[in-house]
Amino acid sequence: MTTDQHQEILRTEGLSKFFPGVKALDNVDFSLRRGEIMALLGENGAGKSTLIKALTGVYHADRGTIWLEGQAISPKNTAHAQQLGIGTVYQEVNLLPNMSVADNLFIGREPKRFGLLRRKEMEKRATELMASYGFSLDVREPLNRFSVAMQQIVAICRAIDLSAKVLILDEPTASLDTQEVELLFDLMRQLRDRGVSLIFVTHFLDQVYQVSDRITVLRNGSFVGCRETCELPQIELVKMMLGRELDTHALQRAGRTLLSDKPVAAFKNYGKKGTIAPFDLEVRPGEIVGLAGLLGSGRTETAEVIFGIKPADSGTALIKGKPQNLRSPHQASVLGIGFCPEDRKTDGIIAAASVRENIILALQAQRGWLRPISRKEQQEIAERFIRQLGIRTPSTEQPIEFLSGGNQQKVLLSRWLLTRPQFLILDEPTRGIDVGAHAEIIRLIETLCADGLALLVISSELEELVGYADRVIIMRDRKQVAEIPLAELSVPAIMNAIAA
């Protein structure tokens, strides 16, 4: 970067945003230079999305100031932010796919004469705009005929043509292949060289080191630090994101005696293009396999492919030794696979339904709605699991939304245990629950394992994984990159593998 490019264009001072019981942003100082690519990183709940929404007028900060080119600004909405010079392009392009490229580039500001659209002039200007960044395409074609990468490039060109001085790219590479990523990076570098400042939000660390000039890390709503990319080793970056220091302590514990050498579930070269790279995985009765990695590394996608939410398009799956085609969650459930998702409020519980109704849901779906479970049987089932798992609720008819996070998690576990699975996937089972419930869930996981259940546990709590997993698989950039056996298992070993 030149000396001029080191000039600050955007700055926040003490920016804070509060929601009931949550500090989404806490006194954040953020700085962006003219003509640089700034990577904005952080785990789930770090505050990245809140910061972006504050900068673009979606949220109004409760405290603090936003400065753009030395002037204090207060964006009222995204349109106002765009007028001020701050544009945003999201992973899901917010354009009109059935309209032409030219229409999308100039929608709302079409060239007109006497109230009539001057289409040829618009198409000429659109062609020239795309060509100015090295892209030759027929701007008369509908946007949806082009790749996702090209649609994003069109969205970026539109934002820049609207006089964006600062461009925020929120997970732009999440659904792109390698060639498409490089195409996007070429455009980002062109924009940087022309003096545009970019904020690049991503979870792909390799891409951060490919394209960014500096890195800002947020954690738990607070500013952790900003470093020059070329001066920040990846292991240091991971420490900043996770908030942990590497030490040499490794927990020594005996391995479990597996009930059988034959895997309950075995996946060979199993994957889905654009979702998760082909992977190999075997899980045996009475074994806990951990899945570790940063947010966006592919942990949840692995679970969704296994459970048939996003059916695989490559490889083979053997369930209890027999080849199976896992095309849906219902099919996976029938074959003895259960899945407790990470976001229990969105993907797990039915908030307004009772504890009883939430518990019997998976079993009823497995049986089919032509074989309804009687109300008496439902009541007996619910009472049994409330007793066995220690679910704290006034009654089986209490709406689950009024239960604590830990008790909601126990209800979800009850739902799947009722189907008598042989292989259970738990995605962040202890997230968002209090300390007491946290310990109870971990004890329950170990009890299920002792009873012969095969478990795949996704967790960001590395100490937890080290405490109960028999081995841990490391994910990075939607690929399996390492496996750590019990004898070598420690928090530093996991962190080093994540950052390698």
From Swiss-Prot:
It catalyses: D-galactofuranose(out) + ATP + H2O = D-galactofuranose(in) + ADP + phosphate + H(+). It is a peripheral membrane protein. The keyword Oxidoreductase does not apply. Residues 10-245, 259-497 form the ABC transporter domain. Pfam families: ABC_tran. Coiled coil: none annotated. GO terms for cellular component: ATP-binding cassette (ABC) transporter complex, substrate-binding subunit-containing. CDD domains: ABC_Carb_Monos_I, ABC_Carb_Monos_II. It is an enzyme of class 7 (translocase). GO terms for molecular function: ABC-type D-galactofuranose transporter; ATP binding; ATP hydrolysis activity; ATPase-coupled transmembrane transporter activity. ATP binds at residues 42-49. InterPro entries: AAA+_ATPase, ABC_carbohydrate_import_ATPase, ABC_transporter-like_ATP-bd, ABC_transporter-like_CS, P-loop_NTPase, YtfR-like. Part of the ABC transporter complex YtfQRT-YjfF involved in galactofuranose transport. Responsible for energy coupling to the transport system. The complex is composed of two ATP-binding proteins (YtfR), two transmembrane proteins (YtfT and YjfF) and a solute-binding protein (YtfQ). Belongs to the ABC transporter superfamily. This is Galactofuranose transporter ATP-binding protein YtfR. It comes from Escherichia coli (strain K12).
